[in-house]
Amino acid sequence: MAGSAVSVICLGEALVDRLGPPAGDPAVDQPVDDRLGGAPANVACALARLGTPVVFAGRVGSDAIGASFVDLFARRGLDASLLQRDAVRPSRIVLVRRASNGERQFQGFAGDQRIGFADQALAPMSLPPA
């Protein structure tokens, strides 16, 4: 963030939405559709695509999902200097059930190793002065 003019800081979760097949259960039914998501990450990417200087502050696992977010943020031109990587906890996967009419219902999480998820362990950080 040094030397950059950040207009917006998006703080929060970066996760995977695991969409099950229509009328199926994303925990057990195939095929599933994994999508990078999380409202703060989505907003950060949208703002960057509009040309707004933005930094994302959050925490992801040191796993394939975390690597996908690092890559996505780089491709979108986001400042990810406040993105933390967790070597112990995994990135969060949200199970999303889709009704036959397309409505979505969030039904829980996948990948829990009984130690929580990376986004739950966000460490305090120094933010740039306003």
Where are the predicted features?
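Conserved N-terminal subdomain of the carbohydrate kinase-like
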Residues: 53-130
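Glycine-rich phosphate/adenosyl-contacting loop at the front of the ribokinase-like
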Residues: 1-78, 120
